């Protein structure tokens, strides 16, 4: 498979994905945003707890 064939296949695959995908509606977008915000908050809390424990034991 040469470079041109690989490029054409990649473009064809990208077009197929874009054809079947759709824009999320407002409800889906809000739900996804809430889930992402909760995940970021959890990671932040875990990081804060790790730093707090490190400070308490003197690292």
From Swiss-Prot:
Coiled coil: none annotated. The keyword Zinc does not apply. It is found in: Cell membrane. GO terms for molecular function: protein transmembrane transporter activity. The chain crosses the membrane at residues 35-55. One of its GO terms (biological process) is protein targeting. InterPro entries: Prot_translocase_SecE_dom_sf, Translocase_Sec61-g, Translocase_SecE/Sec61-g. It is a single-pass membrane protein. Keywords: Cell membrane, Membrane, Protein transport, Translocation, Transmembrane, Transmembrane helix, Transport. Its main location: membrane. GO terms for cellular component: plasma membrane. It comes from the Archaea. Belongs to the SecE/SEC61-gamma family. Component of the Sec protein translocase complex. Heterotrimer consisting of SecY (alpha), SecG (beta) and SecE (gamma) subunits. The heterotrimers can form oligomers, although 1 heterotrimer is thought to be able to translocate proteins. Interacts with the ribosome. May interact with SecDF, and other proteins may be involved. Essential subunit of the Sec protein translocation channel SecYEG. Clamps together the 2 halves of SecY. May contact the channel plug during translocation. This is Protein translocase subunit SecE. It comes from Methanobrevibacter smithii (strain ATCC 35061 / DSM 861 / OCM 144 / PS). The gene is secE.
